[in-house]
């Protein structure tokens, strides 16, 4: 993963921060769960860079029978959050996985979006990026906006 261009950019921005390589960061998560009182707080101190496997673009999780779809979709380029907002549902929702994870294969997302948008040229898509994180919280470290803004601004 450290060979990926976005991973290299992130790691260069964090050059003074200790770094570890893991085949599976669930090992670190389990280690954290067994040794920390405030697992969620401890998870905010770490950032795992990973490759997202699967489809990035998901239908709105609020779609249910009898509801009219407004073509809202979500893209999760990362999960968890560095903030500690007491009102946020992520405090409980992601409690079983406290690790802050950022996916670096943004080019796969852009290819997927291009394919879907090309397949449905007459459909308006609304795409949000903040379902499982504050999507701008780490933008100075993980510059997702450098990729997404030019794509959506065309």
Predicted regions and their residues:
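Short cysteine clusters
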Residues: 81, 85-88
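N-terminal [4Fe-4S]-dependent radical SAM core
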Residues: 26-77, 92-99
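Glycine-/small-residue-rich active-site loops that bind phosphorylated ligands and cofactors
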Residues: 2, 80, 136
């Amino acid at each position: 993963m450290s060979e990926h261009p976005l991973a290299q950019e992130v790691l260069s921005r964090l050059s003074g921060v200790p770094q570890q390589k893991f085949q599976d960061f669930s090992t670190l998560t389990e280690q954290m769960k067994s040794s920390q009182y405030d697992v969620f707080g401890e998870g905010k101190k770490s950032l795992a860079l990973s490759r997202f496997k699967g489809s990035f673009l998901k239908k709105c999780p609020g779609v249910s029978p009898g509801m009219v779809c407004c073509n809202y979709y979500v893209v999760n380029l990362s999960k968890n959050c560095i903030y500690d907002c007491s009102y946020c549902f992520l405090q409980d929702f992601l409690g079983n996985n406290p690790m802050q994870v950022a996916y670096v294969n943004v080019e796969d997302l852009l290819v997927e979006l291009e394919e879907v948008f090309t397949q449905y040229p007459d459909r308006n898509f609304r795409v949000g990026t903040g379902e499982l994180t504050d999507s701008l919280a780490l933008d100075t470290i993980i510059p997702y906006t450098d990729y997404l803004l030019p794509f959506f601004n065309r």
